[in-house]
Amino acid sequence: MTATVRVTAPAKINLHLEVLGQRSDGFHELAMVMQSIDLADQLDCSNRADGLIQLSCDQPGLSCGNDNLVFRAAALLRQRSGFHELGAQIHLRKRIPIGAGLAGGSSDGAAALLALNTLWGLGHTHDHLCAMAAELGSDMPFCLAGGIQLCFGRGECLESVPAAEQSLGVVLVKNPTVSVSTPWAYGECRRLKGDHYLSDEVAFAQRRQDLRAASWLNPLRAAEPPPLRNDLQDVVEPQTASVQMALRLLQDLPGQLRTAMSGSGPSCFALFPNRLDADQALDVARDSFAQAGFDAWSCSFVGHGAKLMP
C-alpha cells in the first residue's frame, strides 16, 4: 500500500441545467452540462494501523463525522473491499465554499474514493469508482470524471463532449452568510413549473438529443458562449436577494460573456474569453463585491475531476 496520497477536488459550475420532469422514484429527470473549474479542495490521506477512519478539516464548523461525504465514501470503499482492517487519516483543506451549488462536498467525496483506492491498493477501475460514487450522490460521478460533460438522469449518467477550444475564464461570487437548500429549490421548481414538466421517456430522449446537438457545445468556445440556462435559477433568484445582487454585479463586469447561478445556488458566475480577462475584471470590481458582502474568485476551466497529485 502507498504511504500517503494527495488528491485535488475541483468545484463545478453548471453551463446548462434543465429540469425535464419528475421520475417515478421521486427524483427529477435532468439534462445538464457541467464544467470543472480550478477552485479546488485538497485531501491528504495516510494509512492508519488501527483500522479507524478519521477525518479532520481546516474549515471550522464543517462536520467531520459520518454525515460527511468524505467519511461516507471511505466507509463504502472499505466495505466493498472486504478488508475491514483498513484505516486512514484524512485531512481536508477546504477552498470551495460550503452550500454554494458548486458540488464541493460531492467533489471531496469523489476525491476520497480516488485517494483511498490508491492508498489501499484496491485496484478498482474508474467505472467501479463511478458506480460507488453514484450511490453516494447524483453529481459525484461527474466530480470523478470532471472536465466538461453532459449529465443526464439524476446527473449520474455522463456523456463526454469535445473539449473546449480554449479555457474560458470565470469570475465566481458567493455571499458566505447565505445558503440555499437543494431540496427546497427542486420543490419550488416542481411547485411553480410542474404543470409544464415533460411526462414520458420519449420526450426526455428528445431533449437529451437536442442538448447533444447544441451548436454552442460542439465545441465550447468564446465566440459562441453558452446560453447558461438554469431552471433552478428561475425559481431561486426571485426569492433570494443575494442571488439578485450577485447577478447585477456580475453583469456590470467589463468583458463578461454571460452570467448565471450555479446549481441550486446561491453562487453565481460570469464567463470570460480567458483567465486574464476574468482576473482583470475581478481586480476592477473586487472592492464592490466586498462592500456588498461577497467573496469572489477568478478561475479557469479545467479538463479533469478529482486528480492524484505528485
From Swiss-Prot:
It holds the Pfam family GHMP_kinases_C. Keywords: ATP-binding, Isoprene biosynthesis, Kinase, Nucleotide-binding, Transferase. The keyword Lyase does not apply. Its EC number is 2.7.1.148. Pathway: Isoprenoid biosynthesis; isopentenyl diphosphate biosynthesis via DXP pathway; isopentenyl diphosphate from 1-deoxy-D-xylulose 5-phosphate: step 3/6. It is an enzyme of class 2 (transferase). ATP binds at P97, I98, G99, A100, G101, L102, A103, G104, G105, S106, S107. The keyword Magnesium does not apply. InterPro entries: GHMP_kinase_C_dom, GHMP_kinase_C_sf, GHMP_kinase_N_dom, IspE, Ribosomal_Su5_D2-typ_SF, Ribsml_uS5_D2-typ_fold_subgr. Signal peptide: none annotated. Belongs to the GHMP kinase family. IspE subfamily. NCBIfam families: ispE (TIGR00154). This is 4-diphosphocytidyl-2-C-methyl-D-erythritol kinase. The lineage of its organism: Bacteria, Bacillati, Cyanobacteriota, Cyanophyceae, Synechococcales. The gene is ispE.
